[in-house]
Amino acid sequence: MTDPRKAHDAEPTTHFGYKNVPESQKAQKVAEVFHSVAAKYDLMNDLMSGGIHRLWKRFTIELSGARHGNRILDIAGGTGDLTRQFSRIVGPTGEVVLADINASMLKVGRDKLLDKGVAGNVRFVQADAEKLPFPDNYFDVVTIAFGLRNVTHKEDAIASMLRVLKPGGRLLVLEFSKPTNQLFSKAYDAYSFSLLPMMGKLITNDSESYRYLAESIRMHPDQETLKGMMEAAGFERVSYHNMTGGIVALHRGIKP
């Protein structure tokens, strides 16, 4: 017979891909995935998407409305694709913060950007999206690209992003989502669960991390659900754009 006190005290669980794990373990498990893939992350992005991820990110930059002198926060900024472009846009009077919870990804991003001569207006900060270590009403734009699905408490992260934005500031969430066509969805599933882990094994000698990435995409809220989460957090004029048949969606919300 189950002890009701133990049941009451049991730690809440959350999904890690298709598995349920204690909430306290998810961040560490996600960290292990990205420690494993960090060195080959850019190469795998190009192979997995056929380079289309660059177009998705370009559209994110355009929709952000970033301009000279702005302060930008690039959460889960990883290897710095968005940060590099934002650094050019905001210029010497602006500021871009590349934040990532994973030290390995942050190091790869810092090294890559320094090699490309991106410095001066960029800071690198190891930070948890759920508890952002920045002042209230500080940033003009906050972005999170392909990172929200790995966050344990997504509502807390969205609320934290709202807090650090200035009134009128924009949040942009670029994330894998739900394909809008049923036949396309089946083909995408076959690719994600067969070819993707195989590529991970060949390129990084790690099929399990890429199996997790595929599973995490399926467990992420769909377009309308994420829109509702942003509205519930307090964002206004929330909208989203499906790209590549809904494989990816870009959500945008404004802080009132």
From Swiss-Prot:
Intrachain disulfide bonds: none
Pathway named in the protein's UniProt entry: Quinol/quinone metabolism; menaquinone biosynthesis; menaquinol from 1,4-dihydroxy-2-naphthoate: step 2/2; Cofactor biosynthesis; ubiquinone biosynthesis
Keyword Manganese: no
Molecular function per GO: 2-methoxy-6-polyprenyl-1,4-benzoquinol methyltransferase activity; demethylmenaquinone methyltransferase activity
Alphabetical GO biological process terms: aerobic respiration; menaquinone biosynthetic process; methylation
Documented EC number(s): 2.1.1.163, 2.1.1.201
InterPro entries associated with the record: SAM-dependent_MTases_sf, UbiE/COQ5_MeTrFase, UbiE/COQ5_MeTrFase_CS
A family per Pfam: Ubie_methyltran
Annotated binding of S-adenosyl-L-methionine, by residue: T79, D100, D128, A129
Keyword vocabulary terms for this entry: Menaquinone biosynthesis, Methyltransferase, S-adenosyl-L-methionine, Transferase, Ubiquinone biosynthesis
Reaction catalysis annotation: a 2-demethylmenaquinol + S-adenosyl-L-methionine = a menaquinol + S-adenosyl-L-homocysteine + H(+); a 2-methoxy-6-(all-trans-polyprenyl)benzene-1,4-diol + S-adenosyl-L-methionine = a 5-methoxy-2-methyl-3-(all-trans-polyprenyl)benzene-1,4-diol + S-adenosyl-L-homocysteine + H(+)
Annotated function: Methyltransferase required for the conversion of demethylmenaquinol (DMKH2) to menaquinol (MKH2) and the conversion of 2-polyprenyl-6-methoxy-1,4-benzoquinol (DDMQH2) to 2-polyprenyl-3-methyl-6-methoxy-1,4-benzoquinol (DMQH2).
Cross-referenced NCBIfam families: MenG_MenH_UbiE, PRK00216.1-1, PRK00216.1-5
Similarity annotation: Belongs to the class I-like SAM-binding methyltransferase superfamily. MenG/UbiE family.
Protein name: Ubiquinone/menaquinone biosynthesis C-methyltransferase UbiE
Gene this chain is encoded by: ubiE
